[in-house]
UniProtKB/Swiss-Prot annotation:
Gene it is expressed from: rimM
A biological process from GO: rRNA processing
Family: Belongs to the RimM family.
Superkingdom of origin organism: Bacteria
One GO cellular component, as annotated: cytoplasm
Domain PRC barrel as annotated: residue spans: 104-183
Disulfide cross-links: none
Record's protein name: Ribosome maturation factor RimM
Length: 183
């Protein structure tokens, strides 16, 4: 007899889209924290995978809703608080193939992490360790190299394509910027 399981048992190129929070109520609901640009977009990408004891597991989203400031989810087969508590802090993962193709000049934040940032004059500013959304534009959070000539530990560089960001090369994991290394 054929099983009805989907073929995807594990993501080939896993991408974390969020995390499950604490349980809510007694019927297996969980808070969910989304790291997608528009928080609700996390529900557009299915199936979700989680890792339990080093093993990938596919979970099925049954329902979700807003509750006060939180979003809460109900997963299939998670029917009480104890089952929900086992999933607290699990990362919600999808396969990168589920994400939309980007336009030229657009990048997923995850692809910029760890990139080396160098000025157009060749000064090494450090590595991208985080991204911030400021409303007007995204900002690269760059951890400076240990012996930074300017004594700077962290730099915030606006991700303004063309103006500040001159070239992004994901193959060599480098970003060229027009930026004063003294900032």
């Amino acid at each position: 007899m054929m099983s009805k399981q989907l073929t995807a048992q594990a993501p080939v190129d896993p991408i974390v889209l969020g995390k499950m929070g604490s349980s809510y109520g007694i019927r297996g609901w969980l808070r969910v924290f989304s790291s997608t640009e528009d928080a609700e977009s996390i529900f557009d990408y299915q199936p979700w995978f989680i890792q339990k004891a080093g093993q990938w597991q596919q979970v099925q989203l049954e329902s979700w809703k807003h509750h006060n400031q939180d979003m809460i989810i109900k997963l299939k087969g998670v029917d009480d608080r104890d089952a929900a508590n086992l999933l607290t802090n699990c990362e919600i993962v999808v396969d990168s193939s589920q994400l939309p193709q980007l336009e030229e000049g657009d990048y997923y934040w995850k692809d910029l992490m760890g990139c080396q940032v160098v000025t157009t004059e060749g000064y090494d500013l450090g590595k991208v360790v985080d991204m911030m959304e400021t409303g007007s534009n995204d900002v690269l959070v760059i951890k400076a190299n240990l012996k930074d000539a300017f004594g700077i530990k962290e730099r915030l560089v606006p991700f303004l394509d063309g103006q500040v960001i001159k070239k992004v090369d994901l193959t060599t994991r480098s970003i060229e910027v027009d930026w004063d290394p003294g900032f």
